[in-house]
């Protein structure tokens, strides 16, 4: 028997019923469903809707169900329609008619919204912890790189010299934005929907403010119609996950390229690579490639969910059942991808000579133009002169390091005797002046700030930093 069988003369068609069953995946909400029901029973008792003995029996029954489910996941099984039906069935089996009173004044429409909010509230911090661990790995690599140099790239063409540490901290910076996006999604879940009923509210004098405090919510939803269909918090979570996966995909792409033989700036650890069944020499970046591939999966969950939401009329619709599979899959995808990325990044070896060699040559052209500009030449004119120098050097198979002082001065009388010494990768990074630049002092300050940010998380989330590892 279903929770809604009273209206119907016949049993549901098995195919139609099975099509709507969600217990196969929403059992993940077991703990949240029981937690919400415990609070609801308490609220019903507090306003006199439940007799004290019934409230006590329900509480005892739900606590025993929760204990059994935590002890043995196989306990959470059956032919039930959804997790709500399962919990109610188990409760009635244990406490009889008192269990049939639990759903007084409550709809599954608000119940499932509550469950999913509770679920995300406890699961988002775990994803944030994994993000912080990866950020820590990048900070550790930045510290280990010290003042090593590498080329930066635009259009996948060498652009300007940067510190390797600056490159690592660039990825840490993007991941910190992902941490904040997930925090924004967590804040968005922080509203109690109970008291909304199916759509119009409940006729029982439930103290929703007290109920919100009991469940750890900072506020109650504003409108019962909106609450019954609101899954904006799901979209926000999926967006946060998708952006994190986009950044992980870009990280993966960078290291797939930079660990390849043609670049060789970094070496993958044997423990975070795979081989070939045919080619003995191969060392493949499979974990990185899978992270890159799974980003499309997460993005698909976001776009699919937005497409589901876009045409729904006001109030609850069964389409909203699709939210849970999107959430669960996106969460698993990000969690596993963060674990894999951490395994790779934390074990990377810098091949400093290869990286430094690639950071010299013609990518110093901007610094040469800046040299002229600092000495009074308009930048656009300096750009033209240096461009002509580059054209000549390419034709001759040379770079700036091969120019004699005479050749420098022939290119422009703005070049002084110090021009050859100024056109080096090390001078290039020291010439930068802004706080977000690759200047070594700026990078060291950025690393300290990143460490401070990570340390600030520890009291709340137990996120490890280098001191505790």
Roles of regions detected by a PLM:
Residues 1-201, 206-208, 274-275, 290, ...:
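A helix-coil-helix interface module used to build multimeric assemblies
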Residues 460-464:
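Charged/polar low-complexity intrinsically disordered segments
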Residues 42-50, 119, 166, 235-243, ...:
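Short, well-ordered beta-strand elements within core beta-sheets of diverse protein domains
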């Amino acid at each position: 028997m279903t929770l809604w069988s009273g209206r119907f003369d016949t049993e549901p068609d098995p195919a139609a019923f099975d099509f709507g069953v969600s217990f196969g995946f929403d059992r993940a909400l077991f703990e949240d469903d029981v937690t919400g029901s415990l609070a609801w029973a308490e609220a019903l008792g507090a306003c006199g809707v439940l007799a004290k003995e019934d409230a006590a029996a329900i509480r005892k029954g739900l606590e025993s169900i929760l204990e059994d489910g935590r002890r043995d996941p196989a306990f959470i099984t059956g032919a039930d329609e959804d997790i709500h039906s399962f919990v109610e069935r188990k409760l009635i089996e244990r406490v009889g008619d008192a269990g049939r009173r639990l759903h007084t004044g409550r709809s599954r429409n608000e119940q499932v919204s509550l469950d999913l909010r509770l679920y995300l509230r406890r699961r988002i911090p775990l994803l944030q912890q994994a993000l912080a661990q990866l950020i820590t790995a990048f900070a550790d690599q930045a510290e280990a790189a010290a003042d090593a140099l590498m080329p930066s790239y635009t259009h996948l063409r060498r652009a300007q010299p940067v510190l390797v540490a600056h490159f690592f901290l660039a990825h840490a910076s993007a991941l910190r934005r992902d941490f904040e996006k997930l925090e924004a999604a967590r804040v968005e879940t922080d509203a109690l929907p109970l008291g909304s009923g199916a759509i119009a509210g409940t006729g029982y004098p439930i103290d929703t403010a007290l109920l919100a405090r009991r469940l750890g919510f900072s506020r109650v939803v504003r409108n019962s119609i909106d609450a019954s269909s609101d899954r904006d918090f799901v979209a926000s979570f999926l967006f946060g996950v998708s952006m994190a996966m986009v950044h992980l995909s870009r990280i993966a792409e960078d290291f797939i390229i930079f660990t390849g033989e043609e670049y060789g700036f970094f070496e993958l650890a044997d423990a975070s690579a795979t081989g070939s069944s045919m080619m003995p020499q191969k060392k493949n970046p499979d974990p990185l490639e899978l992270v890159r591939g799974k980003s499309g999966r997460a993005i698909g969950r976001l776009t699919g969910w937005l497409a589901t939401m876009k045409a729904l009329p006001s109030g609850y619709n069964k389409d909203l059942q699709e939210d849970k599979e999107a959430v669960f899959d996106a969460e698993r995808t990000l969690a596993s991808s963060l674990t894999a990325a951490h395994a790779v990044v934390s074990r990377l070896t810098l091949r400093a000579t290869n990286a430094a060699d690639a950071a010299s040559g013609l990518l110093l052209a901007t610094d040469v133009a800046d040299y002229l500009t600092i000495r009074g030449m308009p930048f656009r004119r300096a750009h033209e002169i240096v461009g002509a120098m580059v054209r000549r050097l390419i034709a001759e198979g040379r770079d700036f390091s091969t120019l004699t002082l005479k050749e420098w001065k022939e290119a422009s009388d703005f070049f002084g005797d110090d021009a050859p010494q100024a056109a080096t990768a090390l001078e290039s990074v020291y010439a930068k002046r802004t706080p977000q630049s690759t200047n070594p002092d700026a990078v060291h300050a950025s690393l300290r700030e990143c460490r401070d940010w990570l340390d600030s998380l520890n009291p709340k989330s137990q996120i490890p930093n280098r001191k505790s590892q």
